[in-house]
């Protein structure tokens, strides 16, 4: 039995005796990683703004970075992340004419709301 398990492991097939842990990480580009983790109501407002005025919600979210919002770019300075968000807003505004920016803006707002749900789960409950 042990020899059979060893043979299977050598072929790349995992057996029931050996544990395999698979970790999946999403690779994000710099613009996508610059989306800040915001409180849920702020993220919903940014989604609403991005839906009706492309890039406006992304522009507002850039200022939350200056207020201390965390991003997936911890090694970059706050001002660099701010300018990445401003660049994303500018791209959304310029390309909204051909509908690409509008769609990108809506998806950007949806990503903000998804990240805000993670922000809410990671926040520490306040004690009175």
UniProtKB/Swiss-Prot annotation:
UniProt keyword Transmembrane helix, yes or no: yes
Domain of life, per lineage: Eukaryota
Membrane topology: Multi-pass membrane protein
Subcellular location: Membrane
Keyword vocabulary terms for this entry: Membrane, Transmembrane, Transmembrane helix
Record field: transmembrane: 40-60, 88-108
GO cellular component terms given for this protein: membrane
Signal peptide start-end: none
Keyword check for GTP-binding: no
PANTHER family: PROTEIN STUM, PROTEIN STUM HOMOLOG
Family classification: Belongs to the SPEC3 family. Stum subfamily.
Record protein name field: Protein stum homolog
Organism: Danio rerio (Zebrafish)
């Amino acid at each position: 039995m042990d020899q059979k398990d060893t043979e299977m492991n050598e072929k790349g097939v995992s057996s029931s005796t050996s544990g395999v842990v698979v970790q999946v990480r999403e690779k994000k580009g710099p613009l996508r990683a610059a989306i800040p983790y915001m409180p849920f109501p702020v993220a919903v407002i940014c989604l609403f703004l991005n839906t009706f005025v492309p890039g406006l919600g992304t522009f507002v979210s850039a200022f939350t970075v200056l207020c201390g919002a965390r991003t997936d770019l911890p090694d970059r300075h706050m001002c660099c992340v701010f300018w990445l968000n401003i660049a994303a807003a500018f791209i959304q505004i310029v390309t909204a004419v051909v509908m690409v920016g509008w769609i990108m803006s809506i998806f950007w707002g949806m990503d903000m709301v998804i990240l805000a749900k993670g922000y809410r789960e990671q926040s520490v409950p306040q004690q009175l």
